[in-house]
């Protein structure tokens, strides 16, 4: 209640709602090649989208906490307070003139950029030749200080899985090493179309 009062005094006037999500189950995959296996799963999350207002107008933002274990979720008060601060920080925003300058991306936006990278390095875009990464293995695609690792077996990782949607085991690997593209995300079909081997990514990255 104290946090809510502070947010109201600071300019939070409403919200677009808060959500609590929880699920658990057991996934089983069987196919005509004789593969059958499964694993238990769980996912829990809380989120909120507050609205801030001042003389310049209204702004909204959001924040969330997500984990395989509900005990590892951030406290609801902490999620709400941070979401409120994000909404308040948007008030009074103004446009910049066109310029060239370094840009620092916050974590959620950086994840979105990585999603664009995965899409461009995935089988469908590659065999249709609609990606700028066609035949780009070994070439410099990022700055030398950047490496991207895929680990399907990361303990309690949100995307961890012992196998993909075809029953193929995923690979612990560096997809980008020192800025160079070292691997693609391929299902068996996409791999055949490219004359390569499956990387265990039917259904996407881990």
Per-segment meaning from a language model:
Residues 1-206:
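N-terminal small-residue-enriched
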């Amino acid at each position: 209640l104290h946090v809510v009062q502070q947010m109201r005094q600071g300019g939070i006037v409403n919200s677009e709602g808060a959500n609590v999500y929880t699920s658990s189950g057991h996934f089983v995959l069987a196919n005509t090649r004789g593969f059958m296996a499964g694993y238990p799963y769980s996912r829990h999350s809380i989120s909120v989208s507050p609205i801030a207002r001042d003389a310049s107008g209204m702004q909204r933002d959001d924040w969330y906490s997500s984990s395989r274990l509900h005990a590892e979720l951030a406290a609801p008060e902490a999620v709400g307070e941070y979401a409120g601060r994000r909404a308040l920080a948007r008030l009074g925003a103004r446009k910049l003139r066109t310029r060239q300058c370094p840009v620092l991306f916050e974590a959620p936006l950086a994840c979105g950029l990585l999603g664009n990278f995965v899409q461009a390095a995935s089988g469908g875009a590659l065999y249709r030749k609609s990606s700028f990464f066609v035949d780009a293995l070994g070439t410099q695609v990022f700055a030398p200080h950047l490496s991207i690792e895929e680990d399907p077996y990361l303990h309690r990782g949100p995307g961890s899985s012992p196998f993909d949607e075809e029953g193929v085991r995923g690979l612990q690997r560096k997809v980008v090493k020192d800025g160079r593209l070292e691997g693609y995300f391929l299902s068996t079909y996409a791999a055949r179309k490219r004359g390569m081997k499956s990387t265990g990514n039917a259904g996407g990255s881990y």
